[in-house]
């Protein structure tokens, strides 16, 4: 599933970041690499961006950027 499809409280592990992503390097700098555990924390009022907990910090990603990240669902946080 894409990271953008996660709902608040759902968790997963990053498996793939699209090699065509415009922000691939920025995601890596933020610690989002294959094997990273992520939790969808919250939706903004209009649903975009969403907040994700990654490596003891919370980051916001736009839907179009989160769609470039494939995760394996691990359940609820």
Regions found by a protein language model. Name each.
Residues 1-2:
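Absolute protein N-terminus
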Residues 22-26:
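Short alpha-helix capping/helix-loop boundary micro-motifs
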Residues 44-77:
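C-terminal structural segments of small proteins and small subunits
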Residues 16-19:
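A structural micro-motif recognizing beta-strand termini
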């Amino acid at each position: 599933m894409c990271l953008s499809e996660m709902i608040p409280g759902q968790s997963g592990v990053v498996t793939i970041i699209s090699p065509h992503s415009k922000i691939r390097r920025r995601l890596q700098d933020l610690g989002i690499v294959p094997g990273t555990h992520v939790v969808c924390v919250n939706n903004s009022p209009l649903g975009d961006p969403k907040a994700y907990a990654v490596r003891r910090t919370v980051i916001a990603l736009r839907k179009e950027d989160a769609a470039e990240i494939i995760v394996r669902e691990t359940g609820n946080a």
